Amino acid sequence: MSWGRLSRLLKPALLCGALAVPGLAGTMCASRDDWRCARSMHEFAAKDIDGHMVCLDKYRGCVCIVTNVASQUGKTDVNYTQLVDLHARYAECGLRILAFPCNQFGRQEPGSNQEIKEFAAGYNVRFDMYSKICVNGDDAHPLWKWMKVQPKGRGMLGNAIKWNFTKFLIDKNGCVVKRYGPMEEPQVIEKDLPCYL
C-alpha cells in the first residue's frame, strides 16, 4: 500500500484521535486550512450544540442532509417541521440530519447555543444540532467551504449560501450529491432519498 493511500485512510482516525488532546482539535479539524484537500464530509469535525467536538466520520455509511438553520426566519416553521418529519420516517433507514445555526442572514439566529437548543426542542428535534457557525466568508466553517465547491454542491449565481435553510444531500461515502436552495422545502428531498438510502 502506498504512503499516500495509507495517509488518506488514517487521516479521519488521526483527526478524531486529536480531538481528545486539548488545543489540537481546533488546528487539526475545526479550523483546518486544508479543507480543499478533503475528499468527503467524513474528514471534518464540528462542535455540537453543547460545545463538544464531533468527528463527522461518525456519519460514514449514512445518508445526510446538512442545512443551515435560523429560528426567526419566515421559513423556520416549514423547514423544522418537515426536517423533523423526514428524520422520524427515515432515520431507521440511515438518514441523518445535521443542522448548523447561522446568524449571517438577516440576523435571524441571534440566540446562544443553549437558546437555539431550547427553541429546537419545541419542534421535538431528534436530529443532530451543531453550534452556531458562519457559512460564508473567511470565517465560514471548513465543511461549508468544502460543500460549496463540490461539483454537485455549487450554487446558482455563485457558490455562496444565499439564505437560511440551504440544504446539501450527502451520500453514504460523504460526497455531496445535490444542493437545494433556501426556497426548496425539505419534502422535495424525499424523492431523491431512495437513490441513496
From Swiss-Prot:
Name of the gene: Gpx4
GO cellular component: cytosol; mitochondrion; nuclear envelope; nucleolus; nucleus; protein-containing complex
Entry comment describing in which tissues the protein is expressed: Present primarily in testis. Expressed in flagella of epididymal sperm. Isoform Cytoplasmic: Highly expressed in testis. Present in spermatogonia, spermatocyte and spermatid (at protein level).
UniProt record, GO biological process: apoptotic process; arachidonate metabolic process; cerebellum development; chromatin organization; dendrite development; lipoxygenase pathway; multicellular organism growth; negative regulation of ferroptosis
Modified residue annotations for Phosphoserine: S40
Top EC class for this record: oxidoreductase
Catalyzed chemical reaction(s): a hydroperoxy polyunsaturated fatty acid + 2 glutathione = a hydroxy polyunsaturated fatty acid + glutathione disulfide + H2O; 2 glutathione + H2O2 = glutathione disulfide + 2 H2O; tert-butyl hydroperoxide + 2 glutathione = tert-butanol + glutathione disulfide + H2O; cumene hydroperoxide + 2 glutathione = 2-phenylpropan-2-ol + glutathione disulfide + H2O
A Gene Ontology molecular function term of the record: phospholipid-hydroperoxide glutathione peroxidase activity
Native species: Rattus norvegicus (Rat)
Top-level taxonomic group: Eukaryota
Assembly information from the UniProt record: Monomer. Has a tendency to form higher mass oligomers. Interacts with FUNDC1; this interaction promotes GPX4 recruitment into mitochondria through TOM/TIM complex where it is degraded by mitophagy.
Family (UniProt): Belongs to the glutathione peroxidase family.
Record function comment: Essential antioxidant peroxidase that directly reduces phospholipid hydroperoxide even if they are incorporated in membranes and lipoproteins. Can also reduce fatty acid hydroperoxide, cholesterol hydroperoxide and thymine hydroperoxide. Plays a key role in protecting cells from oxidative damage by preventing membrane lipid peroxidation. Required to prevent cells from ferroptosis, a non-apoptotic cell death resulting from an iron-dependent accumulation of lipid reactive oxygen species.
Biological classification of the source: Eukaryota, Metazoa, Chordata, Craniata, Vertebrata
EC number of this enzyme: 1.11.1.12, 1.11.1.9
Protein name as it appears in the record: Phospholipid hydroperoxide glutathione peroxidase
Active site per database record: U73
Gene3D superfamilies: Glutaredoxin (3.40.30.10)
Keywords carried by this UniProt record: Cytoplasm, Developmental protein, Lipid metabolism, Mitochondrion, Nucleus, Oxidoreductase, Peroxidase, Phosphoprotein, Selenocysteine, Transit peptide
